[in-house]
Amino acid sequence: MNFEIYNEEIDHKLEAYDYCLDESLIAGKPSKVRHESRLMIVRDSSLKEDYSTNKYTKDLLAELREGDLVVINDTKVMKARLKVELENGQLVELLVLEKSDQSTWLCLAKPAKKLKINKQLNLKSPFAKDIKLKISGIDDETGGRFIKFPENINDLISMNKLLDIFGEIPIPPYIKSSEEESFHENSYQTEYACNPGAVAAPTAGLHLSKSLISNLKKKGILVMPITLHVGYGTFKPIDQEDLSDLKLHKEWVSVSKKVVEEIKRIKKTDRRVIAIGTTSVRALESCYSYAMKDFIPIAKYVDLVIKPGYKFKAVDGLLTNFHLPKSSLLLLVSAMIGRERLLDLYKKATKEKFRFFSYGDAMYISPDSFLEK
């Protein structure tokens, strides 16, 4: 089938990224074995068999070649959901997003209207002494609240220690699950997570088991980590119809010199860079300096928007999940293979009962399927 590659007038409209999905296809729990989730493999659109659906994530091994570089995001999801008490005893919920200043942190609040400036909050736990918090302001961009924590809660390390005592894993609201909190503490975390700072999982990485990673390495495939602390920029719903000037909330990214040097070497050969998840894509593409026309190591906040019309510099292939309608992640994947083709593949995935979203199945976008770079 011939698909329109890029139409700026249509592809920059949010409505063009909507699709229908039966709620029964939203995964409430992951596959029992990580690498046995189903896998749709997307191939060159000119081929008669331009995609495969009878595969599993473990079959990614056969798709990759010796010398390829697989990039994983090693961020770790914090127990960033806090239940706090107002002065009248009413419970409200906070989602800790990021540090703002000193010991002040930006948090999403639910219900937000209850949290007025200068109000006191009480953080309780049966395992520790109560902690007093104060609302110091309202963030115009997110609608969140600036919350003043004790003075010693002034970096990610100290905040993560507090959250380990008082917090819960922030499972997305569309995951309807009767499982205990301890289940999600394991299943909503990649097996290689080691850098606390995320408030949502880099979900493509949930498909990678230790044995699959070991088999990749045995085949001569390099596996290297970057860090992108998944935050509001990844999961915030897009609230504007015109996408031509779309902006995303910043997220912390760290890509080492070692990874950058390997990418530079690969770009001089026929080897490929395969990203595990859209967060890895954003991190790697943020390494490209248009001023220097080269890749550079970074450790900073980034707000890169990838949408149709974007020309990829670093990434050649992608393992990803099936994403929410009208999401920034859907825009990113559309930039790789075209919006029309992606939505057609999603339609086929629904007919074949693939499972969607965070705990769902996976899609491998092969290098041959990419639009011309």
UniProtKB/Swiss-Prot annotation:
Subunit structure: Monomer.
Primary site of residence: cytoplasm
Annotated localization: Cytoplasm
Chemical reaction(s) catalysed: 7-aminomethyl-7-carbaguanosine(34) in tRNA + S-adenosyl-L-methionine = epoxyqueuosine(34) in tRNA + adenine + L-methionine + 2 H(+)
Homology family: Belongs to the QueA family.
Organism of derivation: Prochlorococcus marinus (strain MIT 9515)
Gene (UniProt): queA
Protein name: S-adenosylmethionine:tRNA ribosyltransferase-isomerase
Cellular component terms per the entry's GO annotation: cytoplasm
Key words of the record: Cytoplasm, Queuosine biosynthesis, S-adenosyl-L-methionine, Transferase
One Gene Ontology MF term: S-adenosylmethionine:tRNA ribosyltransferase-isomerase activity
InterPro entries: QueA, QueA_dom1, QueA_dom2, QueA_sf
Pfam families named among the record's database cross-references: Queuosine_synth (PF02547)
EC primary class: transferase
